[in-house]
Amino acid sequence: MKPGATGESDLAEVLPQHKFDSKSLEAYLNQHLSGFGAEREATLTIAQYRAGKSNPTFYLQKGFQTYVLRKKPPGSLLPKAHQIDREFKVQKALFSIGFPVPKPILYCSDTSVIGTEFYIMEHVQGRIFRDLTIPGVSPAERSALYVAIVETLAQLHSLNIQSLQLEGYGIGAGYCKRQVSTWTKQYQAAAHQDIPAMQQLSEWLMKNLPDNDNEENLIHGDFRLDNIIFHPKECRVIAVLDWELSTIGHPLSDLAHFSLFYFWPRTVPMINQGSYSEENSGIPSMEELISIYCRCRGINSSLPNWNFFLALSYFKMAGIAQGVYSRYLLGNNSSEDSFLFANIVQPLAETGLQLSKRTFSTVLPQIDTAGQLFVQTRKGQEVLIKVKHFMKQHILPAEKEVTEFYVQNENSVDKWGKPLVIDKLKEMAKAEGLWNLFLPAVSGLSQVDYALIAEETGKCFFAPDVFNCQAPDTGNMEILHLYGSEEQKKQWLEPLLQGNITSCFCMTEPDVASSDATNIECSIQREEDSYVINGKKWWSSGAGNPKCKIAIVLGRTQNTSLSRHKQHSMILVPMNTPGVEIIRPLSVFGYTDNFHGGHFEIHFNQVRVPATNLILGEGRGFEISQGRLGPGRIHHCMRTVGLAERALQIMCERATQRIAFKKKLYAHEVVAHWIAESRIAIEKIRLLTLKAAHSMDTLGSAGAKKEIAMIKVAAPRAVSKIVDWAIQVCGGAGVSQDYPLANMYAITRVLRLADGPDEVHLSAIATMELRDQAKRLTAKI
């Protein structure tokens, strides 16, 4: 039953085989349903819900009064099926104690009224999701919705049968044995062909009944996503529907039934349920849901018979599918797709058999969070573990090979390309789900989660690229995700997310002080249905990559009537557009930074692109920049923390290996102090950066402005000093190609200029601090 779904798409005209005497119904309700006849002039309208046809369900409206009617289906029925009197009884009991169900109003056993028994309940308005992926909501909301479902199930299973006055609602102990027996008989009565897997599964279930087959709880029997109505705006369950299969039995049967989608065979469509994939961000793992359920019920999360309940659930689903097809053959099933059920009985039974042979650990792995001020999400913890393992097993061992490729191709046409090992590593990372981790809407990770991952990837110069988390692509993908049109996303964001192309960002200019972004002179002028771009850019990172296909350009769409912060816009410029001229690569302390596609000077000479390439709108450039730079600065700073950890490791290794003046280097007090100061500095900037990430998670970019500015100053300064000490400890080797320290120093020193020089951030911090102090002073006065 699906009452309460918003919109008219869930309703249709009453099917011919389900039509009944509406006048007879109206006369009965006028007599027996209080308030129904209050609006005498109003006409009774009846529509049928497209879903919920096992027991046909109808939407009734008379004036301002709305109700839901549920009845038995017509025709020959399987024994003990479609007992709507039980539905009414259990809903009445649950409603009386405040459990979320539609209010049951009236039950009619007189079959002369509309041809079968029926009952009336209230119409509940809310959200019903039929797709397991719950599209259209954020990963955080999707996760919260799933948690709410499991908490509601735990609440149901915690109810006392006696207090509900439902003694006798079920037979008692031995539920699992009865289920195997009942569904075996139901299947055999409806079978249209011999399916050995059903017989084998039935026999296995009967031989492997759980020892505790004496639990007696109220269970739903068909607990799934589309039997839930959520609050229109909140992640809260306001009604559980379809109590046709409810009884007294073992609670784990409900939990297993809800968990079916984790193992659903790929060859079988989940009719009206969408499709589940481990990549569906925000959907908790099965172990997480079990942990929540068990915690709510106060029971141990180790479930020794979990494979039995999963196998039983698939056995029941196969039996139900066979019953649906049987009714189709008899002409009693109104569902348009009921004929499809003939082909899914066997794969469901085979899946049940496979699960019967598996052993499950339903307990979540314990991850030590002691001492963490900024706690990760469970998914963040799991991904971080996988990233650390991937770094250790695959990325760091490839560092020498990647470095040698660029040394050998320094003067070659291939110097802007990537060694083959990078493509192999990318394929491996994508296969393990370690892809696009920086984008919360795609990865389902928080800023704190990704900050700690960024620290790990900062330990190797090419690691971010392996996970498709390399600047400037990350910032450009964030721009397109947050501000791009659907057309822009399809054309550019999707291939960027797949890693098929790369991009560059063109903001800084050689002829103006770009630390004041309002100085930007590159012009973007509207001409009919196009924009024409003219200007010079430099430090356009990534432009030398052969896969770089698109640039995001910041320029002036001047309107003197607007403030100076609303005179700039961002526009998409394909790199092969006539007039785009790549002038030269710029070196950084002598490095051309080949791996990252270099840093280029680019000229735009009468470059014409469609007006649809403008992002968000004219004058929105700085607004977009702030959205782009906030997360990017956190990523940069946490990568420098990882870089600092690597530099400190090198420093300590060298200090323990080398002897000078008859003692190890670490025994010299100055070196020991460098080591100590390095550890102190790393811990300080890590905490400050994690605080900024936490502020972004909780307050957004605007609320984290001060913290982001502080880390942008503190992290590069501190890490530059740490790398400098490491170089000093390593001596001449520290500035050679035998160590990554010289490159590390170049990277960290540049960060004191990139994304705004220290002095600009310091001025901003001072302004914000003075404003905050003034507010406190005013409050005291």
Curated annotation (Swiss-Prot):
Primary enzyme class: oxidoreductase
Listed GO CC annotations: mitochondrial membrane; nucleus; peroxisome
Source organism of this protein record: Pongo abelii (Sumatran orangutan)
Principal location listed in the UniProt entry: other
Transmembrane segments: none
EC number assigned by the record: 1.3.8.-
Required cofactor(s): FAD
Cell compartments where the protein resides: Peroxisome; Mitochondrion membrane
Gene that encodes the chain: ACAD11
Catalytic activity: a 2,3-saturated acyl-CoA + oxidized [electron-transfer flavoprotein] + H(+) = a (2E)-enoyl-CoA + reduced [electron-transfer flavoprotein]; docosanoyl-CoA + oxidized [electron-transfer flavoprotein] + H(+) = (2E)-docosenoyl-CoA + reduced [electron-transfer flavoprotein]; tetracosanoyl-CoA + oxidized [electron-transfer flavoprotein] + H(+) = (2E)-tetracosenoyl-CoA + reduced [electron-transfer flavoprotein]; eicosanoyl-CoA + oxidized [electron-transfer flavoprotein] + H(+) = (2E)-eicosenoyl-CoA + reduced [electron-transfer flavoprotein]
Gene Ontology MF term list: flavin adenine dinucleotide binding; long-chain fatty acyl-CoA dehydrogenase activity; medium-chain fatty acyl-CoA dehydrogenase activity; very-long-chain fatty acyl-CoA dehydrogenase activity
Keywords from the UniProt entry: Acetylation, FAD, Fatty acid metabolism, Flavoprotein, Lipid metabolism, Membrane, Mitochondrion, Oxidoreductase, Peroxisome, Phosphoprotein
Binding site for substrate: S515, G630, P631, G632, R633, G756
Record-listed N6-acetyllysine modification sites: K177
Family recorded in the similarity comment: Belongs to the acyl-CoA dehydrogenase family.
Protein name: Acyl-CoA dehydrogenase family member 11
Modified residues (N6-succinyllysine): K392
Signal sequence bounds: none
Physiological role: Acyl-CoA dehydrogenase, that exhibits maximal activity towards saturated C22-CoA. Probably participates in beta-oxydation and energy production but could also play a role in the metabolism of specific fatty acids to control fatty acids composition of cellular lipids in brain.
InterPro entries: ACAD10_11_N, Acyl-CoA_dehydrogenase, Acyl-CoA_Oxase/DH_mid-dom, Acyl-CoA_Oxase/DH_mid-dom_sf, AcylCo_DH-like_C, AcylCo_DH/oxidase_C, AcylCoA_DH/ox_N, AcylCoA_DH/ox_N_sf
Positions bound to FAD: 505-515, 539-541, 658, 728-732, 757-759
